[in-house]
């Protein structure tokens, strides 16, 4: 019967033939150091997180992944700001090695002071540090963002204006068609009224016959005049609608006839 590895034993999990932790501990000689390193990483990354990180790589790379995770965790505890990369860059990699050895022995890791961690411990390229982003970049990003917002607002305003113009043009066309229909109807009414007025004027302009004058030769003379002269006040004016045209003729003798045309 095969015994479980030191990593699975401290994690209290079953160890099988294809265990992913067993090959990761092959470079550590002492069983106690293997157990201490596994417990330290399980506390730093979490048990499930540690297993996921190890299983993310192939079998031949898992020992290197375990060692890299151990050095990164120790470097982050020693220098919380720059981690193991800052210790390597500043020439203090020995501090990270000492922290790894302390973990394997089960001893606590010593953290450097905050002032020492911030002065000369990180790489000179400040673009990789989120605390040293230049204000120009921020202003440029803000400017680009503001221009994008302005463009979006102008496009939206243009769309709204085009829609409003279309609606206004449609309303004007409807009003124009309505006005045209009303004007057409008013023209018809005006034409009808004009015809009635013309008919009334035609009736008023009826020829008026004056009493015929008989000459001595026996001929009848008719005096025809248009009703354009001012009407005398002595005569009674009859309304146009009540006017009737009538012809009366009387003959006293064979040579004398009297014809009257009355309205």
Swiss-Prot record:
Tissues and organs where the protein is expressed, per its UniProt entry: Expressed in young shoots, roots, stems, leaves and flowers.
Composition bias type Basic and acidic residues, residue spans: 169-178, 190-200
GO biological processes: cellular response to hypoxia; regulation of DNA-templated transcription
Region described as Disordered: spans on this chain: 162-204
InterPro entries assigned to the protein according to its UniProt record, in alphabetical order: LOB, LOBD
Domain of life: Eukaryota
Residue ranges of every copy of the LOB domain listed in the record: 3-109
Pfam families linked to this entry: LOB
Similarity section: Belongs to the LOB domain-containing protein family.
Name recorded for this polypeptide: LOB domain-containing protein 41
Organism encoding this protein: Arabidopsis thaliana (Mouse-ear cress)
Gene (name only): LBD41
């Amino acid at each position: 019967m095969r015994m479980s590895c030191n990593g699975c034993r401290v994690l209290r999990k079953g160890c099988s033939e294809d265990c992913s932790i067993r090959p990761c501990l092959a470079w550590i000689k002492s069983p106690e150091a293997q157990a201490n390193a596994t417990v330290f990483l399980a506390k730093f990354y979490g048990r499930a997180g540690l297993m996921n990180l190890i299983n993310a790589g192939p079998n031949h790379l898992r020992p290197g992944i375990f060692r890299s995770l151990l050095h990164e965790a120790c470097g982050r505890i020693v220098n919380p700001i720059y981690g193991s990369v800052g210790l390597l860059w500043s020439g203090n990699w020995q501090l990270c090695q000492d922290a790894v050895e302390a973990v394997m022995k089960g001893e606590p890791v010593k953290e450097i002071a905050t002032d020492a961690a911030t002065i000369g411990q990180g790489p000179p390229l400040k673009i990789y540090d989120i605390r040293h982003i230049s204000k120009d970049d921020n202003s440029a990003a803000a400017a680009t963002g503001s221009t994008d917002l302005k463009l979006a607002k102008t496009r939206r305003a243009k769309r709204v204006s085009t829609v409003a113009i279309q609606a206004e043009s449609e309303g004007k066309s409807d009003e124009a068609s309505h006005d045209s229909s009303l004007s057409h109807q008013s023209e018809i009414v005006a034409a009808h009224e004009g015809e009635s007025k013309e008919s009334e004027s035609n009736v008023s302009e009826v020829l008026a016959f004056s009493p015929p004058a008989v000459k001595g030769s026996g001929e009848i003379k008719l005096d025809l005049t248009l009703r354009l002269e001012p009407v005398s006040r002595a005569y009674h004016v009859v309304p146009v609608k009540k006017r009737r045209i009538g012809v009366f003729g009387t003959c006293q003798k064979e040579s004398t006839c009297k014809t009257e045309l009355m309205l």
